[in-house]
């Protein structure tokens, strides 16, 4: 699996250390193992996880601004854990309301010795934002409207919302509340992944 990951990274133009690659493969191994009992993802094949979970997460890294991020509705740690591995100087709070997912995240944190993640079991609306975050990240979490409505209290003054989407969500962008606007839309290239992938970056229009 390490060789396949190395080939995917080379195809994507992403350079990682051997240690980072080893951690990513170890995470996939854990996800595959725990998935049998905990049903954490519909993807069953570890090689497919490399594309649909690992690469699909880390291609976002160049667009993130800041040091403190919160991954809302993280599920089994996506995209937060792969991003934490490739961005060791940033910190990621991994938020999910389901206890079984958070138990898995804590086990990953323990086994991979990831000091830059904080797994939290909470509903996003109830989670405090002190200190505020530089970025709020979501992948398959909610519509853009729901994301900014439920998470509006989390980013700081210059914080951003980063929403990973498939096809360009034109209707969702058009229905954003007036106090939020799209700063940019980035088309993402994920080797061996069928279909389009986009990153929608949203900012608050608060004066």
Swiss-Prot record:
Enzyme group, top EC level? transferase
Q: Which GO terms describe its cellular component?
A: cytosol
Q: Which SUPFAM superfamilies match?
A: S-adenosyl-L-methionine-dependent methyltransferases (SSF53335)
GO molecular function: any one?
A: rRNA (guanine-N7-)-methyltransferase activity
In the record, the effect of residue 56 to A is given as:
Low level streptomycin and spectinomycin resistance
User: Could you tell me which CDD domains the record lists for this protein?
Assistant: AdoMet_MTases (cd02440)
For binding S-adenosyl-L-methionine, which residues are annotated in this chain's numbering?
73, 78, 124-125, 139
Name where it's found.
Cytoplasm
Q: Which domain of life is it from?
A: Bacteria
**Its EC number(s):** 2.1.1.170
Q: Which reaction does it catalyse?
A: guanosine(527) in 16S rRNA + S-adenosyl-L-methionine = N(7)-methylguanosine(527) in 16S rRNA + S-adenosyl-L-homocysteine
Give the UniProt family note. Answer: Belongs to the methyltransferase superfamily. RNA methyltransferase RsmG family.
Role: Specifically methylates the N7 position of guanine in position 527 of 16S rRNA.
Query: What is the designated name of this protein?
Result: Ribosomal RNA small subunit methyltransferase G
Q: Which gene encodes it?
A: rsmG
